[in-house]
Regions:
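Tandem CBS (Cystathionine beta-synthase) repeat/Bateman regulatory domains
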Residues: 1-113
C-alpha cells in the first residue's frame, strides 16, 4: 500500500476515529503505533463489530480492541514470500516492520496479486 500512513492510529484514538480511518483508508485495516512508530497492533472491521457487540462506546480507546500480536514481516522480505505467507495464513494485509519493530509499510493482498 503506497500511503499506509493514512491508516495509522495511536493507542489513545477513539473507536469513532478508528471507524473513520478504516472507512477513509479503504483497505479494511488500521495500524496502531506509538509515538516512535513502533507497531502496537492492528484493527479490522471485525474488531469494531465485536467492540460494539460488547457495548464499548465510541469514545473507548482503540487499544482496548486492537490485536496486540499481529503477524508481521521484516522489511527485507520479498513480495513473493509475503504473498505466500499471506496465502498460508489467510490474510488480506501484512504490516511491514524493520529490525527494531518500527512500522515501515503495509502490504495488501490486492496490491500483491
Amino acid at each position: 500500500m503506497d500511503d499506509w500512513r493514512k491508516v495509522l492510529l495511536t493507542p489513545k484514538d477513539s473507536l469513532e476515529r478508528t471507524i473513520k480511518v478504516l472507512h477513509e483508508g479503504g483497505c479494511r485495516i488500521a495500524l496502531v503505533a506509538d509515538e516512535f512508530g513502533m507497531l502496537l497492533g492492528t484493527v479490522t472491521d471485525g474488531d469494531i463489530r465485536r467492540a460494539l457487540i460488547n457495548q464499548l462506546t465510541m469514545e473507548s480507546p482503540v487499544s482496548l480492541i486492537m490485536n496486540g500480536n499481529p503477524i508481521t514481516v521484516d522489511d527485507k522480505v520479498k513480495n513473493k514470500d509475503i504473498l505466500s505467507l499471506m496465502s498460508d495464513k489467510g490474510l488480506l494485509h501484512m504490516p511491514i516492520i524493520d529490525k527494531d519493530g518500527i512500522l515501515c509499510g503495509l502490504e495488501t493482498l490486492q496490491h500483491l496479486i
